[in-house]
A protein has these predicted regions:
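Signature of lipid phosphatidyltransferase scaffolds
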Residues: 122, 126-169
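Conserved beta-strand termini and adjacent loop/short-helix elements that scaffold enzyme active sites
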Residues: 31-33, 83-85, 109-111
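Short, flexible loop segments at the rims of nucleotide/cofactor-binding pockets, characterized by
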Residues: 28-34, 57-60, 104-107
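Short, small/polar-rich loop/turn modules that mediate ligand/substrate recognition or access, typified
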Residues: 2-40, 88-91, 139-142, 160-169
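Primarily the HKD phosphodiesterase
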Residues: 42-104
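Solvent-exposed loop/turn segments at secondary-structure junctions
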Residues: 59-63, 86-90, 112-115, 126-127, ...
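Alpha-helical scaffolding within the catalytic cores
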Residues: 37-40, 67-68, 114
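Extracellular/periplasmic catalytic domains that process cell-envelope and extracellular macromolecules
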Residues: 24, 47-48, 99-100, 112-115, ...
Length: 169
């Protein structure tokens, strides 16, 4: 079983990230698709959620494990909420329908030309962010997914999520 605490405690910060730009006490783990299984990386983080997952998604499809993990989290009593881009619903692999069926609250960000954020804030302490789309085809792309364990970073992303929520439909 994956535990966020140990890998984050052991995580090292890439030399490409200036130390001054990292919140004190933050631990960072990174994943690069094609070379690594970023869907499994995200699923492990979601599986550790106990209270809340705030999701911002440009693309969201079934089949990668992410939607399925969010449905399971909701089933465990985790408060899962989603803000999606207006173009997210798509035929056949639509991730919105199973989430809605599970009782996940969903809003559409129709104000922005494109709601291109791809983030999750988990339990006000862990933030997933990067270019990685929550879609089945992302594994074939060159994308990145970063997991930051920091209450301060999570608070900033949660505040932005709530700002976007204020303008959704």
């Amino acid at each position: 079983m994956f535990s966020i605490a140990l890998p984050l405690a052991l995580a090292t910060i890439s030399p490409a990230v200036p130390a001054a730009s990292v919140t004190s006490g933050a631990a960072i783990a990174v994943c690069f698709s094609r070379e690594e299984d970023c869907a499994a990386f995200a699923v492990r983080a979601i599986n550790n959620a106990q209270r809340e997952v705030l999701v911002s998604a440009y693309g969201l499809t079934t089949g990668s494990g992410t939607v399925e993990a969010l449905v399971r989290a909701k089933g465990r009593g985790v408060d899962v909420r989603l803000i999606a881009d207006k173009t997210t619903p798509c035929p056949a692999t639509n991730g919105i329908e199973p989430l809605a069926a599970a009782g996940v609250q969903i809003w559409i960000d129709g104000q922005a030309r494109i709601a291109h954020a791809k983030t999750m804030v988990i339990d006000e302490a862990v933030t997933l962010m990067g270019s990685y789309n929550w879609i089945r085809g992302a594994a074939a792309n060159s994308e990145n997914l970063n997991l930051v364990s920091s209450v301060a970073v999570a608070a900033a992303y949660a505040a932005h999520w709530r700002e976007r929520l204020a303008v959704t439909v």
